Amino acid sequence: MFVLHSYSKLPNINEYAKAKSTPLDVFVWGTGSMCELGLGPSAKNKEVKRPRLNPYLTEEKLGGTKIVDFAVGGMHTLALDGKNRIWSWGGNDSEVLGRDTCQAKEVLKDIDGKNGNDDDDDDEDGDLNEAESTPALVENLPEGEIVQLAATDNLSAALLSNGDVYSWGCFRCNEGLLGFLRDEIKLQKTPLKIKELKKHCPIMRSVKIILLALDSKEWMPGVNGQQYQLGRRILERHRYRSLEPQQFGLYNIKYIASGDFHCFAIDHSHNVYAWGLNQYGQCALTGDNGELEDGSVLMKPTLIPELSHKGIKEIAAGEHHTLALTEDGQVYAWGRYDMKEIGIPKDKLPKSTFKINTGTHGSFSFLQNLFAVKIKTIGVGSHHSFAVTEDGVVYAWGFAETYGPGLGPSIDDVEKPTRIVNTATKNEDILLIGAGGQFSVSGGVKFEDEEKAEVRLDKYEDLE
């Protein structure tokens, strides 16, 4: 059993997960107006324009251990340390942090002399909630080895080595709160064992979706299916059934991935399937000339010929765009283009690029490799993207107004993959990367030999 994140390597779905053990330095950047960066309550930490080492997650602060894995949701992050503890930080309106943060909110009110009705409560220059903005331990976790984590917009989950799944938070739909488990629990504040998911694998991080597979069959629990993310139709009168795991017709599956409103699966014959929203071609299925219908949707898992048998081992999907990484280190991108999500300059777009009604380049589906160097992992936020080279250098592109790419003070969207250059990560081999709506997180290992880092720097400067 295993949990699969958007930055994970392709596993064998029949193998049991093993907890990661490599100690990581954790870096954060972007906009943290909802406490997403985990840098503490000071207002000056709301915007970080390049990767910054999180001082609360160092070996000293964690009592002689480091973070070994993390999962990034829309506005929060979960991090697993070497002592089998989960740390959380970020917005907690949906109880995704798995711990009480209400007391800190009350303290802030008392200090400021405010109440919940004051217009000044949303002052952008004020300090953040200390309990939400500072990493702290998830409460009431069970005994047992935690092997992987998952985080979405409004939900958190942890997988144990014995196959148990614990979760907390909620699911939301277009109208607001949908619930947590059937119609019985609306908000779950601390980890709860999900009995229906015993021996299920894997869990995949997405904004609104958790995908699971049992014996290589696809299952979908706890999802708003209004955009057909479930791969099946949900009638309004049975809406709470979307909060129950149900098989929906895919077999022999070895890999799954999901974006905000679309999903992918790869079977053991290397066929790739997609379903969900496709109005920007994010499912990699368009007409012969790249045309798309407004509101295009794949209502059930659909074979995607252009992606099948390409050796794809990893898929990372955002709100309306998708990246894929192949076994030989190539990266493909497709989907929405108007915020530069796919990393291809405008003058390099093929004629088949579809334009939305405004005349803006809306979607792109033709597959071409983005890099001349080998890539080892990929990651995406809602509208920005990352690729990490085999020696740990990060390239970023996409929507930059909230500094999600980590490339500095410019708020101009980044049209093509651009190398992150800063002091904090200069000597780091980045191993993991993930992102939410307006922030990003990476984890790396520092080179013992600084000369090796200098050689790497010279290599990429020569390439550029």
UniProtKB/Swiss-Prot annotation:
Its cellular-component GO annotations read:
chromatin; cytoplasm; nucleus
User: Which controlled-vocabulary keywords does the entry list?
Assistant: Cell cycle, Cell division, Guanine-nucleotide releasing factor, Mitosis, Nucleus, Repeat
Q: What GO biological process term is on the record, naming one?
A: nucleus organization
Region annotation (Disordered) maps to: 111-130
Q: Which GO terms describe its molecular function?
A: guanyl-nucleotide exchange factor activity
Tell me the compartments it is located in. Nucleus
Where is it predominantly found?
Answer: nucleus
SUPFAM superfamilies for this protein: RCC1/BLIP-II (SSF50985)
Q: Which Pfam families match?
A: WD40_RLD
Q: Where is the composition biased (Acidic residues)?
A: 118-130
Enumerate the RCC1 repeat regions by residue range.
23-82, 84-135, 162-216, 269-327, 329-390, 391-445
* Function, in words: Promotes the exchange of Ran(SPI1)-bound GDP by GTP. Involved in the control of mitosis. Regulates a variety of nuclear events, including mitotic check-point, chromosome decondensation and mRNA processing/transport.
**Identification of the protein by name:** Protein RCC1
The upper taxonomy is: Eukaryota, Fungi, Dikarya, Ascomycota, Saccharomycotina
